[in-house]
Design a protein with these regions (language model features):
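Walker A/P-loop
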Residues: 228-254
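Pre-Walker A (Motif I) flank of P-loop NTPase domains
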Residues: 228-235, 261-262, 319-321
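Accessory nucleic-acid engagement/destabilization modules that flank
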Residues: 1-198
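Post-Walker A helix-loop "phosphate-sensing" segment adjacent to the P-loop in P-loop NTPases
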Residues: 253-262, 284-288
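Conserved Walker A/P-loop ATP-binding site and its immediately adjacent core
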Residues: 260-283, 296
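Conserved pre-motif I regulatory segment
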Residues: 19, 200-236
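Alpha-helical scaffold elements adjacent to nucleotide-binding pockets in ATP/GTP-utilizing enzyme cores
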Residues: 74, 78, 90, 250, ...
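Inter-Walker segment of RecA-like/P-loop motor cores
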Residues: 285-325
Length: 325
């Protein structure tokens, strides 16, 4: 029997094995940024094993005449059996959002424990996955999640793992149905750092007046500060002191110094976001800066330019070097 998922416009199906393996590969590549590649790969393999059940396959092949099937519980339960609550949460919520943990006595509710307690029998039993994919019993976990003195690090890790899985699942499904989309793009942060240095070099060399000299002092300190160790930093400068470019210079310098790949610039008020985003786009290039907030109009009318289309896609998962929000 061929196990399938995702009906394409041409009437063919994506194989379930292909989807499982490609979601695992994508999730692993995303999670590699925080040392969780192996763990995310296994989570990707777990996420859709419920579709290997008889009812799951009937639903895939004839959705109009078949009731919805809970395909997330099987992977959730297997993750729990593997003593992997992180993956259990991620798999349980990969369509509806992260569930509450609940209580061990829960039954029939939307909590994680209710899924773990659910009894899969007959047409919902998905053991056929074992004929197509290999899910490793043991994987490497980042050591830092177990060294935290409280649970905050582990809850953040769960959300990060969940995010990697959901993005990978969405992207592979999109590719299977619509073909490869114009995602990604933009220059490296190293290139953007060179741009901001080139833009500000004339100011540093010859300040026009005393105010410009003070702005230069702020800028120079931010650039030097970017070389410091990771941590939380504050920049306290009066209005007119040049915080916009100085703070971005710090961010780019710091990110390049520590091998990071994205700047997320978070500020209040949409008017200020729009103003700062324009400054960054003028210096760094519009193709490298994504402005995303409640007032951004994202057209989907078939008339948009390739660049506008790429930015609309980037708003879905912030796939841009610099995000201003």
């Amino acid at each position: 029997m061929e196990y399938v998922t995702h009906l394409r416009p041409d009437g063919t199906y994506q194989s379930l094995r292909e989807h499982e393996e490609q979601v695992a590969a994508l999730a692993g590549s995303f999670a590699g940024e925080f040392g969780a590649e192996e763990h995310a790969r296994r989570t990707g393999l777990l996420h859709d094993i419920g579709k290997y059940s008889a009812n799951g396959q009937r639903r895939q092949r004839d959705p109009e005449h078949t009731a919805k099937v809970d395909h997330a519980t099987a992977g959730t339960q297997l993750a729990f059996q593997m003593k992997d609550p992180f993956a259990a949460f991620a798999v349980a919520g990969h369509h509806g959002g992260l569930p509450d943990g609940g209580e061990k006595s829960n039954d029939g509710s939307g909590t994680l424990w209710a899924r773990i307690n659910k009894h899969l029998t007959g047409g919902d039993e998905p053991s056929a996955w074992k004929t197509e994919i290999h899910i490793p019993e043991k994987v490497h976990f980042p050591e830092w999640i177990f060294s935290e003195k409280d649970s905050r690090g582990r809850t953040m890790y769960t959300r990060m793992l969940f995010s990697c899985l959901v993005d990978a699942d969405f992207l592979d499904t999109e590719t299977a149905i619509q073909g490869k989309q114009a995602r990604g793009g933009g220059e490296t942060l190293d290139c953007l750092l060179k741009k901001i240095r080139a833009h500000t070099a004339p100011w540093l060399q010859a300040p026009a007046n005393e105010l410009c000299a003070k702005r230069n002092s702020v800028l120079a300190r931010c650039m030097r500060g970017g070389e410091d160790e990771k941590g939380l930093y504050t920049l306290t400068v009066p209005t007119g002191g040049g915080k916009t470019l100085s703070s971005m210079a710090f961010a780019l310098s710091h990110a390049v110094r520590h091998g990071m790949k994205r700047i997320i610039y978070v500020i209040p008020y949409t008017s200020i976001i729009e103003q700062n985003a324009k400054v960054f786009a003028d210096v760094l290039g519009a193709e490298n800066v994504l402005e995303h907030h409640s007032q951004v109009e994202i057209a989907d009318d078939g008339e948009e330019t390739p660049e506008a289309y790429r930015k609309r896609l980037a708003c879905e998962n912030w796939d841009a070097p610099v995000v201003v929000t």
